[in-house]
A protein has these predicted regions:
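Pyridoxal 5′-phosphate
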Residues: 1-402
Length: 402
């Protein structure tokens, strides 16, 4: 699907093997339209935004704010002012962890996360536990990577102030029932944040349908540039939360005695934004929409189903997470026999196959699974069944070496 839009996919690895890029859960490749748009802005429109009356600044500002509107429509946000640009999902979660805790939580108050969280949705809360004395509680999961919703319900107390969970596990591929998770939180009058880093690239997101209070995702995992991400937050919370950082562009007025802050979303966007990256993100979204989000999801789900089917024919294959492709996204973590994940990944690389190895920034999940790491293959819209066949053949070649 649209492989011709990604020049890097035609290169040879070690001057011999065609690139089989299956590390999309870490970052995706970028289509020419994104690269060309960013280059064009640097060449012809480069100027700081929000700060100039001259033509270039106004043109750059229009592109930057136009990107915000593109994001608003992409995830179906009611108000553009509820879209905050960040450096990525990690910064978005850190922003909420810092500012929400400052505004709404006290020592002994609790936040609920899950067993399958990325470190970016664990460490920020632990930092707040050390600073503010909040308590982090964890939703358990089954052996096949499904969250225990009954146990989740039992975690709520009168001190629970926030739930923050991943939409899709970056290790297991599990698609969590976020609408149910949010509904249960709201039944306890608790707001809920969703980490959408692994879902926004692969499925249509409607934050009003999910009814989450915060939603975060990254541009580079969905064919956009690095260093740009998005935090959606409901106005009623963002208005009460203090700024995450101070500096230019987030102020109303400044005196040596007191500073007032800009209106949303600028209160949370201190300093010069990466306005070239926001333009690139908008172009990536437009690229995905041009193909069709449902078409992308169907293609990747079929690819995942086929990969699960073919990989399970390999003796000693152990796949983590749900084996039903309907319950998971385009991520497959695996081990084969006693072969170390680093050995498998290194030898696959020698065949031109790019996969990710290690704990995938999810060490607590690895401990729950009783392992220290996996090999992870993750798919994007440009992957195909021939590449899955190459992966399976490569795994078999590696197995034959041990």
């Amino acid at each position: 699907m649209n492989r011709q839009d990604f020049p890097i996919l035609s290169r040879k690895i070690y001057d011999k093997y065609p690139l089989v890029y299956l590390d999309n859960g870490a970052t995706t490749q970028k289509p020419l339209c994104v690269l060309d748009a960013m280059r064009e802005e640097y060449l012809n429109v480069n100027a700081n935004v929000h700060r100039g009356v001259h033509y270039l600044s106004q043109q750059a500002t229009d592109l930057h704010e136009g990107a915000r509107e593109t994001v608003r429509q992409f995830i179906n946000v009611e108000k553009t002012s509820e879209i905050v640009f960040t450096r990525g999902t990690t910064e978005a979660i850190n922003l909420v962890a810092s500012s929400f805790v400052e505004a709404f939580m006290h020592e002994g108050d609790e936040v609920i996360i899950s067993t399958m969280e990325h470190h970016s949705n664990i460490v920020p809360w632990q930092l707040q536990a050390e600073k503010k004395g909040i308590v982090v509680r964890v939703i358990p999961m089954s052996d096949d990577g499904i969250l225990d919703l009954e146990a989740y319900k039992a975690l709520f107390t009168d001190r629970t102030k926030l739930v923050s969970v991943t939409h899709v596990s970056n290790v297991l591929g599990t698609v969590n029932p976020v609408k149910d998770i949010v509904r249960i939180a709201h039944e306890h009058r608790v707001p809920c944040m969703i980490d959408g880093a692994q879902s926004a690239p692969h499925m249509r997101i409607d934050v009003q349908d999910i009814d989450c209070d915060f939603f975060a995702f990254s541009g580079h995992k969905m064919y956009g540039p690095t260093g740009i991400g998005v935090l959606y937050g409901k106005e009623k919370y963002l208005e009460q939360m203090p700024p995450y950082q101070g500096g230019g562009d987030m102020i109303g007025t400044v005196t040596f005695e007191k500073t007032t802050y800009a209106a949303l979303p600028y209160k949370f966007e201190a300093g010069t934004p990466d306005y070239i990256a926001t333009h690139g993100l908008a172009k990536a979204i437009e690229y995905m929409q041009g193909i069709g989000l449902e078409k992308i999801e169907a293609h990747e789900r079929e690819l995942t189903r086929y990969a699960l089917e073919q990989m399970q024919t390999i003796p000693g294959m152990r796949i983590f997470g749900p084996l039903d492709a309907a319950k998971r996204d385009a991520v497959i973590s695996f081990l084969v026999g006693d072969i170390h994940h680093l050995d498998m990944g290194t030898l696959l690389d020698r065949l031109g196959i790019a996969v990710r190895t290690g704990h995938h920034c999810a060490e607590p999940l690895m401990r729950r699974l009783g392992i220290n790491g996996t090999v992870r293959a993750s798919f994007a819209l440009y992957n195909n069944k021939e590449e899955v066949d190459t992966l399976v053949s490569g795994i078999k070649r590696v197995v034959a070496m041990f």
